[in-house]
Design a protein with these regions (language model features):
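Thiamine diphosphate
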Residues: 1-167, 171, ...
C-alpha cells in the first residue's frame, strides 16, 4: 500500500525534528499523527508538547509564534487548516516576506506555513470552505510557495521548505497516493524545480495540484486521438524563475500552451505563466482554463 500524502508530510517533519532538536511545530485541532501499513507517526507523543504545541484556535497567534521563533533562529512550522489560511495573511505579507529585506539580508527567517488547501466540496461550511489561496500567497514578495501533487513530492518539498532560510508557504491539497514510491529515508525536492510528468511534441499543458490527476487523464485521452501532449507540473509557484525555463523550452517545441488552474480566472497563477511565455515565445498560442470569477458553490448539485 503506498504512503498517503499526509503520512509522507509527517514523515518529513518527523525526520527533520529528529535532525534538528530546535524545530518546533504549532498546530490547532488537527492532531499531527498518521498511520501507514503497520507503522504510525505521533509527533506529539514522540517529541512532547514543548516542541509540538497544541494551540488555541487562533491562526494569527500560531503564525505569529512561528514567525517570532524564526526571528531568533529557531525554525518553526505553523499548521493552519483549510478554512483559516486567509487569517494570517497580513503577518505573512507585512512581516514574513519583508523582514529579511528590512535587515539588509543580515537575518534569516526559517519558517514554514503549512497551509491546508481544501478543494470545492459540499459540507457544513459550503462556500466558506473554498480556501485555495495559493495565488494570493504567490504574489507576496519575499515568500516561497510550493504545491506538491503526490506524496513523493510532498515529503521532499516539506524537507526543502524546513531547511530553507526563507519563509515558505507549503500548500497542502488532498491529492491521491500516486506517483513515485516514497522512500523511508530523507530526501529533498528542490524548490523552483518543475517536473515534466509526460513528454510530448504537439501541445504543452501546465497545471498543478489539485488538477494533476485530471490533467494526466486528459493527456491519455489526447494520446488516443493522436495528440502528443507534454505535461509540466510547476511544483513551485513562487519564485517562478527556476520553473519558467522548462516551460518556455517546451512551448518553443510545441508552439501551444494550455494551462489548468483551480483558482479564479482573473489573476490566477497560470495567468502569470502565460504572460511570461508570451514575452519569451512570440507567435505561440495560449489558452487558460480556470474557475469563473465568482464565489465557489457549496451545493452538491453544483459541484
Amino acid at each position: 500500500m503506498p504512503k498517503s500524502t499526509s503520512y509522507a508530510i509527517l514523515e518529513a517533519i518527523q525526520g527533520e525534528m529528529r535532525r534538528d532538536k530546535h524545530l518546533t511545530l504549532f498546530y490547532e485541532y488537527q492532531r499531527p499523527a498518521a498511520g501507514w501499513s503497520n507503522r504510525g507517526i505521533n509527533l506529539e507523543g514522540e517529541f512532547g508538547r514543548t516542541r509540538v504545541r497544541f494551540c488555541a484556535i487562533d491562526e494569527e497567534w500560531i503564525v505569529g509564534g512561528a514567525l517570532g521563533m524564526s526571528m531568533i533562529g529557531v525554525p518553526a512550522i505553523a499548521h493552519i487548516p483549510s478554512m483559516a489560511t486567509f487569517i494570517p495573511y497580513e503577518l505573512m505579507f507585512n512581516h514574513a516576506g519583508k523582514l529579511r529585506h528590512m535587515t539588509g539580508g543580515q537575518a534569516a527567517f526559517p519558517m514554514v506555513l503549512w497551509a491546508d488547501m481544501a478543494r470545492r466540496w459540499a459540507f457544513q461550511a459550503g462556500q466558506h470552505a473554498d480556501a485555495g489561496l495559493e495565488s494570493s500567497y504567490a504574489r507576496l514578495a519575499g515568500l516561497k510557495v510550493v504545491i506538491p501533487s503526490n506524496p513523493y513530492d510532498a515529503k521532499g518539498l516539506m524537507i526543502s521548505a524546513i531547511r530553507d532560510v526563507d519563509p515558505v508557504v507549503f500548500c497542502d491539497y488532498p491529492v491521491p497516493a500516486s506517483g513515485p514510491e516514497v522512500p523511508d529515508e530523507p530526501y529533498m525536492v528542490p524548490i523552483g524545480e518543475p517536473a515534466v510528468r509526460t513528454e510530448g511534441k504537439d501541445i504543452t499543458i501546465v497545471g498543478y495540484a489539485p488538477q494533476t490527476a485530471e490533467i494526466a487523464r486528459a493527456v491519455e485521452e489526447l494520446k488516443n486521438d493522436g495528440i502528443s501532449a507534454e505535461f509540466i507540473d510547476p511544483r513551485t509557484l513562487a519564485p517562478l524563475e527556476g520553473v519558467m525555463p522548462t516551460i518556455i523550452e517546451s512551448v518553443k517545441k510545441t508552439g501551444r500552451l494550455l494551462t489548468s488552474d483551480e483558482g479564479s480566472y482573473t489573476f490566477c497563477n497560470c495567468a502569470e505563466i502565460i504572460a511570461r511565455v508570451a514575452e519569451a515565445v512570440p507567435g505561440a498560442k495560449f489558452k487558460r482554463l480556470a474557475f469563473p470569477d465568482a464565489p465557489a458553490p457549496g451545493a452538491p448539485e453544483m459541484l
